[in-house]
Amino acid sequence: MNKKRVISIVTAAILAATLAGCGSSNSSQPAASTEAATEAAAETEAATEEAAPSDGPVANADKPVAWFNRQPSNSTTGELDMTALNFNKDTYYVGFNANQGAELQGQMIADYIEAHIDEIDRNGDGVIGYVLAIGDIGHNDSIARTRGVRKALGTGVEKDGEIDPSPIGTNTDGSATSVQDGKLTIGGKEYTVRELASQEMKNSAGATWDAATAGNAISTWAASFGDQIDVIASNNDGMGMSMFNGWSKAEKVPTFGYDANSDAVAAIAEGYGGTISQHADVQAYLTLRVVRNCLDGVDIDTGIGTADAAGNVLTDDVYEYNADQRSYYALNVAVTADNYSDYLDSTVTYAPVSNQLDTATSPSKKVWLDIYNASDNFLSSTYQPLLQNYDDLLNLEVDYIGGDGQTESNITNRLGNPSEYDAFCINMVKTDNAASYTSLLSQ
């Protein structure tokens, strides 16, 4: 029955009961029969409103949105785009704690240098020289990782109250102004730590975090000052492995990355120095779980901090939630020679949240999801396979869209039919470009 029709009938019943109750009474209190009728009518109306189907399809602008991997933000200042994060009441971001992970990577490198000081200064000049592969100068995660390395090694220079994350080009003479020489005292001996070179790994087409560019960079650096390079630090494993396979593996120069990609973890047995797991298994789960909860109309914490009916739940040592930022962050773990065997398969779902949902309470829904760059090693070889493992468990039919890593239009041109989907999981090319997607959903 039409909701408006039901309410009209209920209203008529209230009026009839009220007239009957007022026939001979002069009391200022409503008659008992009137109270009963009013309460019954109110209960009927509430039940009808709850049970009645919505008047037509849900507007695209009101459907759940999960930003992931690239947090909507100003690529210059890092300021969060709260308009995008509050696009509607069912909008969230899923990523990882960038600062915690960045500091962990920097400390992992510093600890390795101290533990291997006898062999790490390859030319015996008392200078521990390192090169740094920067992913994207406008990406918050890349900025944090560059700062984390420079902070731990004492090479950072403050600018506007923060460590300057700028690439320096070549700095073999230590004259660059965006970094400084650090000092380490190990076994009573003082060593200088110098960032010999760093650059943003962007290819000619504009794609950042580019592994091939990193491979070319290490070849150029090695040809010019290879005997001075004692350590390689990379903002991610894709670039790190390109440099490792291209030069540092043969030269036995420890290389450190980020993401715990399967090939990088396996390479630790061959001399790769270490990497950071950003708990992609937890991130991928959260990406789909938040839209699942919104679609089901349950508390957003269901199956996250609070166990669901299937027993899925996360503990607070693997994630955190910032309500003001509407953001879920996975916590990071260092992967080294001591524990790498536990991380060899990065596509295995996280056991505590690997239980199948019941289709009776979580029916099949259709989700549009894009990967900003189909060639990105971490997203294509780790994150997407995890998403594909979780989508079945969460009863979600997901259409996966792979971008070219260069332009938003390469992705948004394939979002011409948003009405066909129940929710959207968005991975932008650039963190500034949230409006490219929300404008489509708002039409």
Describe each model-derived feature in a short phrase.
Residues 22, 26-443:
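A residue-level marker of the well-folded mature domains of exported/periplasmic proteins
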Residues 16-19:
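Bacterial Sec-type N-terminal signal peptides, specifically the leucine/valine-rich hydrophobic h-region
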